[in-house]
């Protein structure tokens, strides 16, 4: 394992950590970076590259689990009231998270092979980036015209299910899970922070499940020679995601979704021009 290969692992881990939970599409960015670094450089087989992506995604998942550790313990009944809303009898439940997960989980299971075969390209990512940006701009426009639910514990079952339906849009590479669900939550009456909190918590089980299935699928591609590459990528993804998630949650109610939408449109247009 050369220093150059470890540098590539670090870059890929950083890209994953920066984009996994920001509403800019980590899958889209990884497809772009994959074309530039992994495939063009022939660093590893396609199977091994897929396993690497799963490993660095697990680094990002661990970061979010740490940020939301109190909430997770509360959901599991291991920690009592952590907010004033819970003192008043309002509380986000595991059932609400579950109903939010169902739509995307079912569609993802049914169309996984089709999505992998036909939608994982730079062109489809560019389309997803622009389409998702339009949804985000619409969400911010709607948000200015209604009073929003400002805490996670006041989310209704109806809102949880509807946000889950919006998550189905993220099955299109480039659309972004957080972009679609935060936008959906805002359109449905949540403020940006509550929508982001629900998005990140809801993402953990579905991402862990998908990562586990993918890791099992590509298990034969793992080898001891690649372990340093995988470890560097995992650590970089974890550290960067830990910083990004905390920073994003602190600012999202102030900056809204417009800056991310502008970035997505610019990147999407550039990619489409390159593909012409």
Swiss-Prot record:
It comes from Bacillus subtilis (strain 168). Bacitracin is thought to be involved in the inhibition of peptidoglycan synthesis by sequestering undecaprenyl diphosphate, thereby reducing the pool of lipid carrier available. Signal peptide: none annotated. Belongs to the UppP family. The chain crosses the membrane at residues 48-68, 92-112, 119-139, 155-175, 196-216, 225-245, 255-275. It catalyses: di-trans,octa-cis-undecaprenyl diphosphate + H2O = di-trans,octa-cis-undecaprenyl phosphate + phosphate + H(+). It is an enzyme of class 3 (hydrolase). The keyword Zinc-finger does not apply. Keywords: Antibiotic resistance, Cell membrane, Cell shape, Cell wall biogenesis/degradation, Hydrolase, Membrane, Peptidoglycan synthesis, Transmembrane, Transmembrane helix. Its main location: membrane. It is a multi-pass membrane protein. It is found in: Cell membrane. Catalyzes the dephosphorylation of undecaprenyl diphosphate (UPP). Confers resistance to bacitracin. This is Undecaprenyl-diphosphatase. GO terms for cellular component: plasma membrane. The keyword Hydrolase applies. It holds the Pfam family BacA.
């Amino acid at each position: 394992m050369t220093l150059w290969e470890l540098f590539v692992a670090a870059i890929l881990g950083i890209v994953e950590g920066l984009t996994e939970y920001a509403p800019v599409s980590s899958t889209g960015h990884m497809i772009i970076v994959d074309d530039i670094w992994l495939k063009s450089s022939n660093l590893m087989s396609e199977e091994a590259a897929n396993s690497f992506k799963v490993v660095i995604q697990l680094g990002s998942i661990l970061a979010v689990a740490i940020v939301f550790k109190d909430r997770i313990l509360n959901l599991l009944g291991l920690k009592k009231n952590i907010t004033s809303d819970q003192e008043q009898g309002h509380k986000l439940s595991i059932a609400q998270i579950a109903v939010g997960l169902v739509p995307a989980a079912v569609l993802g299971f049914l169309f996984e092979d089709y999505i992998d075969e036909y939608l994982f390209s730079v062109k489809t990512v560019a389309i997803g980036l622009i389409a998702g940006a339009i949804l985000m701009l619409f969400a911010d426009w709607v948000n200015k015209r209604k009073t929003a639910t400002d805490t996670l514990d006041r989310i209704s079952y109806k809102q949880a299910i509807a946000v889950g339906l919006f998550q189905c849009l993220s099955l299109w590479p480039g659309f972004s899970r957080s972009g679609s669900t935060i936008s959906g939550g805002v359109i449905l009456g949540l403020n940006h922070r509550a929508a982001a909190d629900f998005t990140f918590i809801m993402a953990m089980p579905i991402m862990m499940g998908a990562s586990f299935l993918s890791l099992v699928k590509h298990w034969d591609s793992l080898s001891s020679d690649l372990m340093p590459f995988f470890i560097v990528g995992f650590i970089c993804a974890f550290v960067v995601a830990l910083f990004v998630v905390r920073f994003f949650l602190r600012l999202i109610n102030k900056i809204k979704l417009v800056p991310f939408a502008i970035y997505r449109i610019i990147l999407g247009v550039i990619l489409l021009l390159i593909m012409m």
